[in-house]
A protein has these predicted regions:
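Charged, surface-exposed helical/loop "interaction arms" that form contiguous linear patches used
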Residues: 369, 373, 383-386, 405, ...
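Active-site phosphate-binding and catalytic loops of NTP-dependent enzymes
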Residues: 91, 114-123, 259, 395-402, ...
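Extended, charged coiled-coil "arm/hinge" scaffolds of SMC/Rad50-like chromosome-maintenance ATPases
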Residues: 508, 512-546
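Charged catalytic and DNA/RNA-contacting regions of genome-maintenance
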Residues: 1-339, 348, 352-355, 359-368, ...
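Conserved phosphate-binding elements of NTP-dependent enzyme cores
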Residues: 5, 13-17, 24, 545, ...
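Short secondary-structure subsegments characteristic of cysteine-rich extracellular domains
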Residues: 369-393, 503-511, 581-583, 589, ...
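ATPase nucleotide-binding head domains, primarily ABC-like/P-loop NTPase cores
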Residues: 39-40, 238, 308-309, 316-319, ...
Length: 872
């Protein structure tokens, strides 16, 4: 829309001056009680939010398109826009319209983006909202920084250069950012860009190289974290991870308008400290959401999430997404869980106390960003009052090193509780502007002003009685309205008694209203007392809030420690409820599970009893368990169960088993299930091959690999060949040699047990009664050479006629194959098996095709069809 800006009204010129500074944002322009949008913003957002599009005079011939939202409902609209990827610049009135002559001063105080949200009602309680900064230089490293503005978490990491793109994708999968900042060179990471576009589907914000530079950000970052040099943060002076931190802090400073005191410490993560889980493993194991419905219920997080606090819920999700690989740290968590399990009374008391603990992290964020309400401060005080009781209970289990350390990190926060209790009333209003927030006795001047306010009615009543006596007007009344203030009202029958010092202000049908100098003076005293009291109360509230902000470091450390205690207690609670056992952590390469169960499937079964299974894997004779059996028999559930038990052990949780010895693995890979990746334009088979390729590239001898039905997305011969080659490669100790669970319906692979060291055949037990089967869900040694496909089809509900016809065809095929194997000398024209028929089709196709008349592309198509026929 072309606009002659010089002809615009002063207010519209002010609007455009701000809009030009933030061209990629929707500008919420504060006008009184509304945020207004104009011109293109108004047209676009009125459609998005289904708002009425109106107009406003702007100095031009045509009215400016306009739509608006009430300022008190802004969060609801922000949420909808941010979810759709919009960035919003919040423009506030900086001067009071009532006292400002001319144009009200306005400026943008904050930019709201998907990655910079701090409002609790716009965020998921149990999940972090990460902003990511990604910096890459062609031919160099890739640095990453993740920050959650709502909690103050900020993490920097440098993915390993080897397999760089895969490592970057793993990190993005772990933190699932809502928004990613990146420099131009980052676009060269093609696989990463594809992952962001197809899988994460988050907002990407391109930033100039200067935003990641030391020249612009070094001093600012050092000042922010209060360090003389970057080495104190374990950051190199130069490096991609440092550039990523620069880019992060630059963007936060820009969007929050320098309000970034929330970040006081930075964590530099070592990727090697955590179990490697790529996107497919996280998805297939259903760690935080189900594979099909993308729902929380049915995931491992849903099962484990009995944490009492919001901080604990977020910490639990982080632990599930970042299992440990250092045995000492794993065992420290397990020991802490064990003592809670043994001392169940202490566990019950701790969890009861945690029920009254509020979200310290996000409360302090609102304190720091000056948006905390009086009720937020009371929530801080309520939490602070719970801490002595919590520490007293933790003293009873402090013989465990981890719990002793966490206990030492929890501060009493007496100052927080005392200050808030002295300053804020018991049940404060939502906003300090409503008054009645500061407790009586906290400040002498405020008490004095309130005395005048509260005595105002008595003063007016006395004056009313005095004027009646002085004038003899028995019906004289003193009233108040917002236009005239206080007034004296006299009815017509007493007009002759009105004294000369009464000044007429308003004539009504049956009465006149007057004022006097004494009445105006009294009015000024009363009204100014109210205004002064509100201003003083707001000032005192700001002082209290700022005093609490100074306690940030103490509160932050306390919040982190309480969150960890909450997760450990939740682990103990889940272990008791579900009869889990403490796993033995080992480093000898053995994974041994007796009576193992799938944690989620077991919980979801309402009436059925889950059938437990044993597992034994090592790095020698039992590297690969080759599992055969019909579909629906439970192969996939069993393999996922082994992976989940391993993962649960490495997050420090008890596991669903009678006994478990878990040797720490460095990575878990899964190739499970089949679903066409239509958004990527790839078939089931192509997706499967990509996933298998990644496993073969990145698995190590210390990895755990889960492979389900490799090769089923193509022809039988191709599928068998690929499956066998993959199994041989993984099991070969000179190639990978890692622990693997390999489920297949290709019975031809059973002989691998006799040809490759480390392969052991297992199968799902099936009980057959005539033409029906029953799955026993039990893993037993030995392979089977019957897939029971027709029986499974019958169970699935295929019509009986179709099932019978399938049996007839199966017998015919088996007879033909047997005849072919018995009579290899038989002439071609006597063989009526499928292979011969397909060969004949290929010959006839070639005879009928004149290659001279075909283009190169058409020749290739014919060749492909012939090849497919010959392959079967």
């Amino acid at each position: 829309m072309e606009i002659q800006k010089e002809k615009l009204s002063p207010m519209m010129q002010q609007y455009f001056a701000l809009k030009e500074k933030y061209p990629d944002c929707v500008l919420f322009f504060r006008l009184g009680d509304f945020y207004e949008m104009f011109f293109d913003d108004a047209i676009r957002i009125s459609r998005e939010l289904e708002l009425t599009l109106t107009g406003r005079d702007c100095g031009l011939k045509e009215r400016a398109p306009m739509c608006g939202i009430p300022y008190h409902s802004v969060d609801m609209y922000l949420k909808r826009l941010v979810e759709r990827g919009y960035k919003i610049a919040i423009c506030e009135q900086l001067t009071d319209p009532a006292t400002t002559k001319g144009l009200v001063e306005r400026d943008v105080i904050r930019i709201v983006t998907p990655g910079t949200l701090i409002e609790s009602n716009l965020l998921e309680e149990g999940a972090n909202n990460y902003l990511c900064s990604l910096y890459f230089e062609e031919g160099g490293d890739c640095g990453l920084c993740f920050a959650d503005l709502s909690t103050g978490d900020i993490i920097a990491l440098l993915p390993e250069q080897k397999n760089l793109e895969a490592n970057v994708i793993d990190a993005l999968s772990r933190y699932t950012p809502a928004e990613i900042l990146m420099n131009e060179d980052a676009l060269l990471l093609k696989n990463v860009m594809e992952f962001i576009k197809i899988r994460l589907q988050c907002v990407v914000t391109m930033r100039d190289a200067e935003c990641f530079s030391a020249e612009r950000n070094h001093d600012f970052v050092c000042h922010q974290f209060q360090v003389p040099e970057l080495s104190y943060l374990q950051l190199p002076e130069t490096g991609s991870e440092t550039a990523a931190v620069y880019g992060m802090m630059d963007y936060i400073k820009e969007t929050q308008k320098n309000q970034i005191a929330r970040f006081i410490s930075l964590t530099v993560n070592d990727d090697d400290a955590y179990l490697g889980l790529d996107f497919n493993a996280r998805r297939n194991l259903e760690l935080t959401e189900t594979l099909r419905g993308k729902e929380r219920k049915g995931s491992l997080l849903w099962l484990m999430n009995t944490a009492k606090t919001s901080m604990g819920k977020r910490m639990l999700k982080t632990w599930i997404e970042q299992p440990l690989v250092q045995p000492a740290k794993i065992m420290a968590r397990l020991d802490a869980v064990e003592i809670f399990v043994k001392k169940s009374v202490v566990l019950m008391e701790v969890r009861s106390i945690l029920d009254s603990v509020y979200d310290l992290e996000r409360l302090m964020t609102r304190v720091l960003y000056k948006t905390a309400t009086p009720r937020d401060l009371k929530a801080l005080a309520t939490t602070a009052r719970q801490i002595p009781a919590l520490k007293a209970e933790l003293e009873k289990v402090a013989d465990r090193k981890l719990l002793a350390r966490l206990l030492s990190q929890i501060s009493n926060l007496d100052m927080v509780a005392d200050l808030v209790d002295r300053a804020i009333v018991e049940n404060p209003p939502v906003s300090v502007k409503d008054g009645g927030v500061i407790r009586e006795g906290f400040h002498q001047d405020l008490d004095y002003l309130r005395g005048i306010m509260n005595g105002g009615n008595q003063i007016i009543e006395k004056m009313e009685q005095s004027e009646r006596e002085r004038t003899g007007i028995k019906g004289l009344k003193i009233g108040f309205n917002r236009v005239f203030g206080y007034y004296i009202e006299v009815t017509r029958s007493y007009y002759d008694l009105v004294p000369d010092d009464y000044v007429r202000k308003q004539t009504l049908t049956n009465c006149e209203r007057f004022i006097t100098p004494d009445l105006k003076k009294t009015e000024n005293d009363i009204l100014s007392a109210k205004e002064k009291a509100l201003r003083l109360e707001e000032s005192l509230y700001v002082e209290v809030r700022d005093c609490l902000a100074a306690q940030l470091k103490q509160v932050q450390e306390t919040a982190s420690a309480i969150a960890q205690v909450d997760v450990l207690a939740a682990f103990a609670n889940v272990a008791i409820e579900n009869q889990y056992t403490k796993p033995e952590i080992a480093m000898d390469g053995v994974i041994q599970i007796r009576g193992g169960r799938h944690p989620v499937v077991e919980r979801m079964l309402s009436d059925d009893i889950f059938v437990p299974n044993d597992t034994y894997l090592d790095n020698k004779a039992n590297r690969m368990l080759l599992i055969t059996g019909p579909n629906m028999a439970g192969k996939s559930t069993y393999m996922r169960q082994v992976a989940l038990i391993t993962l649960m052990a490495q997050i420090g949780s008890f596991v669903p088993a009678d006994y478990a010895k878990i040797s720490v693995v460095d990575k878990i890979f899964t190739r499970v299930g089949a679903s066409d990746d239509l958004t990527a334009g790839q078939s089931t088979f192509m997706v499967e091959m990509h996933e298998v390729s990644d496993i073969l590239k990145y698995a190590t001898p210390n990895s755990l690999v889960i492979l389900d039905e490799v090769g089923r997305g193509t022809s039988t011969f191709d599928g068998v060949s690929i499956a066998r080659a993959v199994a041989e490669y993984i099991c070969n100790s000179r190639q990978i040699g890692c622990k693997t669970l390999f489920a297949t319906h290709y019975h031809e692979l059973i002989d691998l047990e006799h040809t490759i060291e480390g392969v052991k055949n297992y199968s799902i037990a099936v009980k057959k009664h005539g033409d029906t089967i029953r799955f026993l869900r039990k893993i037993v040694p030995g392979g089977i050479d019957d897939s029971y496909g027709i029986e499974v089809a019958k169970l699935a509900g295929l019509p009986e006629k179709v099932v019978k016809r399938a049996r007839v065809l199966l017998r015919q095929m088996e007879q033909q194959i047997a005849a072919q194997n018995q009579k290899p000398e038989q002439s071609d024209d006597m063989q009526y098996n499928f292979a011969a028929m397909q060969q004949e089709q290929a010959v006839q196709m070639l005879k009928k095709t004149n290659l001279q008349e075909l283009s190169d592309a058409e020749c290739r198509q014919v060749l492909e069809e012939v090849t497919n026929l010959l392959r079967g």
